[in-house]
Amino acid sequence: MGAVRVPLPVRVLPQIAERAWFTPPRPSARARARDALALEGVEPITLTVDGRPRPGFVTGEGPLMVVAHGWGGRAAQMLDLARSAARRGYRAVAIDSPGHNTDDKSTSDGFQMAAGLEAVVASFGPPAGVIAHSLGAIATVMAFRDRPPDVAVWLAPVLDVRESLEIFSHRAKLAPWTARSLKRRVERFIGDWWPALTAGPDADLPGAEILIVHDPADPDSGFDRSAALADRRAKTRLVEAPETGHNLLLRDPNVIDSVERFLDEARVVTNHPGP
């Protein structure tokens, strides 16, 4: 929300704040036009998620790489990273999550984002790897914790919903009682998944080789949690991406190079055939 004027009901009425929390931002018409140009010549797909058609794309041949956008994102944002995976011998698949981009359903949540990833696997088979941005990292934990891929790339990952709630409450200028009520409502909604979605440095895809790429000054997700995870967990690498913020790293050439090097090195470790 940033400097946008926040309507008073959002700030003081918990039920309105809750609706705002579960409503991802939509891309501008200009962004959608850029997406359409970028996707020209890329193989389109449409998958059904909870009875709703969700568009996306597939590129490359080889083991499946599931590509997950973040909150308020869309598949087209991840095209450069999907192509990097394709160059390294993977079949990269991404779709727009439910409630995102052009979907006429206005709300979404981590469960729906995870359902989108599960739909990819249902159509294309088990994943060898995942590439995920922001809240997409938590969605990969929800979708694949019990059947983790061999490799995972997390870009500016959101690893603790509590941090996101704090950022949202601050930017929306929620009244203190509204912020407290919103947290209780979100915790109740998440239910048994609350420990996993607030794990922070203890977040995990068991056994996977993980690369984390993060701007130390990212205003939307805490670099300190990524650093602590990399320090704690074996088979985890952290690459700092200064001055890329929360979204620019998705197209940053240095980030793309880091991802490709990681996929090459991880392929040797996990004994997947090369491209």
Regions found by a protein language model. Give the residues of each.
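An N-terminal hydrophobic leader/cap segment in hydrolases
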Residues: 1-48
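Catalytic histidine-centered segment of alpha/beta-hydrolase-like enzymes
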Residues: 244-254
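Hydrolase active-site cap/lid region
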Residues: 146-190
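Short beta-strand/loop motif that positions the catalytic acidic residue
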Residues: 205-207, 212-214, 218
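Conserved alpha/beta-hydrolase "acid-adjacent" motif
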Residues: 219-225
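Alpha/beta-hydrolase active-site loop
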Residues: 106-128
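Conserved alpha/beta-hydrolase
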Residues: 75, 82-104
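Gly/Ala-rich beta-loop-alpha elbow adjacent to hydrolase catalytic centers
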Residues: 131-140
